[in-house]
Amino acid sequence: MKNKNSGYKLSLNKLYNLKNQYYIYILASKRNGVLYIGVTSNLVKRIYEHKNNIIEGFSKKYHIHKLVYYETTNDIESAIRREKQLKKWNRKWKLEIIEKNNPEWKDLYFKLI
C-alpha cells in the first residue's frame, strides 16, 4: 500500500526477520537496465529502503528499485559467498539467471508484502 509521501507502508511483522533466513537479491532499473546485487537478512525491509531512497549510494543514484531476482539461505556466510560470486559474473550470466527465473522482469517485491 502506497502512502502520500510516495513510500510504501509495511506491517511491523514484515520489517523483522523472523525466520533467520538470508537473501541474495538482484535489483534492476528496468528490463536489461542497470543491475545491483546485495545481501540482507530482511528482504522486505531492505527493498523497501531501496524503493524509498533511504539508502545512499549506487541504487539511489541510478534509480534501481525493481526486485527481479532473489535466493534464500539459512547461513550468512554462504549468502555473502553467493553475493560475491554473482557480482563476479559477467552481465550476460546475470541477465540469464533473471530471464530463467523471472522472464517478464516483474517486480517481485509486491509478492513479498
List each model region and its residues:
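GIY-YIG nuclease catalytic motif and its immediate N-terminal context
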Residues: 1-56, 60-72, 77-84, 97, ...
